[in-house]
Amino acid sequence: MPNWLKKQMQKAFLEKDNYQIKLLNQCWYFYRKKHCS
């Protein structure tokens, strides 16, 4: 996981920002799919 994404994730979890967490999860999912396939 890239550093910027980790930071965003931690921030979202600290603020209990569910919308942001969902968004970042999708972002990470697509990122992984793109780089792994």
UniProtKB/Swiss-Prot annotation:
> Where does the record say this protein resides?
Forespore
Give GO terms for biological process.
sporulation resulting in formation of a cellular spore
Q: What conditions trigger expression of this protein?
A: Expressed during sporulation and is regulated by the mother cell-specific transcription factors sigma E and SpoIIID.
Q: Does the keyword Phosphoprotein apply?
A: no
Q: Keyword Protein transport: yes or no? A: no
Q: Major location, coarse class?
A: other
What are its GO cellular component terms?
A: intracellular immature spore
> Which InterPro entries did the record assign?
CmpA (IPR047764)
Q: What is the recorded name of this protein?
A: Cortex morphogenetic protein A
* Organism per entry: Bacillus subtilis (strain 168)
